[in-house]
Regions:
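Juxtamembrane helix-loop-helix connectors linking adjacent transmembrane helices
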Residues: 2-16, 30-113, 131
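Membrane-interface helix/loop boundary segments of multi-pass membrane proteins
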Residues: 36, 53-54, 63, 67, ...
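Alpha-helical transmembrane segments of polytopic integral membrane proteins
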Residues: 22-27, 69-73, 113, 117, ...
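Hydrophobic core segments of transmembrane alpha-helices in multi-pass, intramembrane catalytic enzymes
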Residues: 18-19, 105-108, 158-166
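Hydrophobic membrane-targeting alpha-helices
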Residues: 25-29, 67, 71-75, 148, ...
Length: 193
């Protein structure tokens, strides 16, 4: 297997291997809850129907949050310089000519990452923080953990702004699917850029 394809396969398998255990633990925890006490749509509120409203809500929120995220990124680069943050593997694959490697990396970034990260940050962390600290602090706290989890100093503030938008979308829509759509749009545009 060529180097870019080999590394794209490794990223896809590695991401799935890292995401599966916490999701299985979460499932076992949720299975033990009294179903009568759960909010409409379940604790994670994974209501897909109607899917077109999720697409609309996610797309609209993405359009609303994109200007402040881009502005924050521009200000960061203007005042502290380019701190990097771009994934070196992504650059290697994008500079290569293997369409399968590019496709596998796109699936990881645009489908798997938004599904997993929204389940963790907006599906679990946001409501847990909300119960302990209130809505405002839960929005900020989940956004901060989301930004820090990406391990990129140069992208910390733009990711914090993105996380704030995702958390507010989750609270306003009452569903996770619009957040996944918004996150996928963000990752997709970032991937293409």
């Amino acid at each position: 297997i060529a180097a870019p394809l080999n590394q794209s396969v490794a990223v896809l398998i590695g991401y799935c291997a890292l995401a599966t255990p916490p999701l299985l633990i979460l499932k076992s925890q949720l299975d033990g809850l009294d179903q009568r006490l759960l909010p409409a749509g379940g604790w994670l509120q994974w209501r897909v129907s109607p899917w077109w409203t999720a697409l609309f809500q996610g797309g609209r929120a993405w359009l609303m949050v994109m200007p402040p995220v881009v502005l924050t990124g521009w200000l960061m680069s203007r005042f502290i310089g380019d701190q990097g943050g771009s994934n070196p593997l992504l650059e290697m694959v994008l500079n290569g000519s293997d369409p399968l490697a590019l496709f596998l990396l796109a699936i990881t970034a645009v489908v798997l990452a938004p599904l997993f990260e929204e389940t963790v940050f907006r599906g679990v962390l946001l409501p847990v923080l909300g119960r302990s600290f209130g809505r405002g602090w839960s929005v900020f706290g989940s956004a901060l953990v989301f930004a820090v989890a990406h391990l990129s100093i140069g992208e910390l503030l733009p990711l914090l702004v993105l996380g704030l938008g995702l958390a507010l979308l989750r609270l306003s829509s009452g569903r996770l699917l619009p957040c996944v759509v918004m996150h996928a749009l963000w990752n997709g545009v970032t991937f293409l850029n």
